[in-house]
Structures are given as C-alpha cells and as structure tokens.
Amino acid sequence: MKNLFYLFFTSLIALSCNQKSPEAQTSEAETPSLYIEWYGDNEVANEMVTRGIEHVMNVEFDKAFVLFEAAMQLDSTLFGPHVMLAQFSNANSENQEFHYARAKVLAADKNVNSKLFVSLLDEKNEKGKRQVWGADNHLIWKKMYENEPRGRFMRFWYTFGMAAEEGAEDALLKMLGDFKSEGSNYGPVLNNLGYFYMKNGNMDKAKEYFERYCQIRPNGYNSHDSMGEYYFNNKDYENSLLHYQMALDNYPAASNAKTMIAEIKTLMK
C-alpha cells in the first residue's frame, strides 16, 4: 500500500512539471509579483493545491475540497487551502470558523494580495456564511487583480463577477485569448462565456461555448453539467438528460447531475 501511495504522489509531481500553475508565472515572472502565495515547501502538497485550484475554476468544488484538505494535512503552513475550506464549510459551523481563523493567522506574514484573499471571508452574510465570491466581494477581487494583473486566478474571479455594463463580454473574450496564448487552462473561461451569453439571451453563442468546453474537457463533469443546464433551459430534455448522465458517469458523486436526472425523468413521463 505504501508503494502505491508513493507511485501516486511521485506521478503527481512529474505531471506538475508539465502544467502551468493557475496563479502564476508568465514570461514576466522574474519581476516582483503579488501573486497569492498558495505554495510552501512540500511538492506533493503544492501539486494538490494546483489541482484543487483547477477544480475550483471548473466549479468542481467537491473534488477541490478533497485536494485542499489533503494539502493542508501535508503542509500545515499553507493558508490558501484554509480559505477555500472555509468557503466550502456550512454557515456558522465550527469548521468555517476554524478555517477562517487559521487562514488569518497563516497569512499574517504574506503579501498584500494573500491578505486580501483571506479578507474576502471577513464578513458573514445574513445566513452566517463566509464567502469568497459574491457581489459584496467584487471590489476586493478588483483590487487584487489591479495589484497583480498577471495572476490568472485573481483575474478569472474578478472577471467572473463583472456585470455586462462593466464590459464583461470583452473582458472574458480577452482573457480567453490570453489564456490560450499562454498555454493555460482556458476551459473555465469557455464555461463563463457560455453562462454569460445564456444569461443575456444569446442561446446560439451560449451553445457554442458550452460545446467547446465539453470538447476540451470531455472527462470533466462540470462541462457536461453546464451543457445539460443549457439544454434543460431550452426544454430539450433528451439532450439535457444525455449530458447530465455523462457528468454522472465521469463523476458518480456529482449531486447536481443526480438531482437533474431525476427531475428530467419526471418531466419526460
């Protein structure tokens, strides 16, 4: 069993050498930076953080939860996993407050954007939930992005929160082009564009971007979940069911896919 774990972790490290961190390192990486300081000295923990970030950007939060929890256990100095685990915790729970408190302590000597990242959790909503996303935090994401425009994670979530009148469409399309040219994972941007166009009533464009997302992430589950939602909103229940089933096949614990499959089957009776 120990040998199996060793092979698994060494494989993670080897794979990480061929992947860009979602938060880093463009051609300007040698200049002083204000990237969120996600990483520590444990290579395996760092790789788990990187993969956790990727799942967060792809809205695959349950997989991200497992990776951040494991990273935190391997390297107790990391604050970023605590931020995300606080986000994933239930409102007013002991876990939420524990992870928030640990994140503040561990980020105390980090750079300004790392501290701003933790500060996203400072205010609870009316239900007692600490959240890194939402309209109330948009200005903090904007400040983080302005501090370090090369940070892909910060840029992604700042742009995610932009309204149409702020220039969201142009910002998303520019980010898509930049991520592609950098060799970064651009699937999440396709997903956001799909939702942007669907929200604004351009169903043809929405379908185009959701289809592209499925094409570049065929083994993910959120890509098919998004495509399923598109078809569901357009009352094409057969294709919606097909994609929700694909999401469930790719990740049998995908709870939203299970719920939607049951709902669609009821509607199709």
Set out the residue ranges of the language-model regions.
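Alpha-helical segment of the N-proximal tetratricopeptide repeat
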Residues: 41-70, 74, 115-133, 147, ...
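Canonical tetratricopeptide repeat
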Residues: 84, 154-157, 192, 226, ...
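Alpha-helical adaptor scaffolds
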Residues: 121-122, 155-215, 222
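Canonical positions in the second alpha-helix
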Residues: 70-71, 102-106, 141-144, 175-179, ...
